Amino acid sequence: MTKNQEYALQYADYAMAQMRRYGIPASVTLAQGILESSNGQSRLARNENNHFGIKATSSWIAEGGKYGIYTDDKPNEKFCSYDSVGDSYEHHSRFLKENSRYAGCFKLSPDDYKGWAQSIEKAGYATGGKYAENLQKIIEQNGLQKYDRQVMQEMTAQGRQFGVEHN
């Protein structure tokens, strides 16, 4: 089993829960986590439970959000710090859902991982090039689409809609 597959297996439940809640493909969430956190091994992931490289905004800090200081694109940047990896996954989903620049993503089907990857890149999620291509490669090489299929089948069988809270 590859490190990417180990990461996916460890965090698939979080990604699938986010797919049910927000309609974001689990495969894309996992691929972003793999890429952004170096399979959960980056300093940011290990020290702050931040698996998606989300920076701490002034509103995050004003609301009492914790943060760590790291050098990324610039020295001494503030990154969100979370109590758990699950909190990181939830904040990542809310970050995409509540940020208008990602609105186009939510017009796509929850199982359209290629469209989602391209739309996330187009909206400017990452500063590096070929972001969508890298996400798709991670998804396809590690069979992460199986998590999307599992959630799609489950939601269809239960007659449930994505993006609607279910008790």
Label for each model-derived stretch:
Residues M1-N167:
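Catalytic cores of secreted/periplasmic lytic hydrolases that degrade extracellular macromolecules
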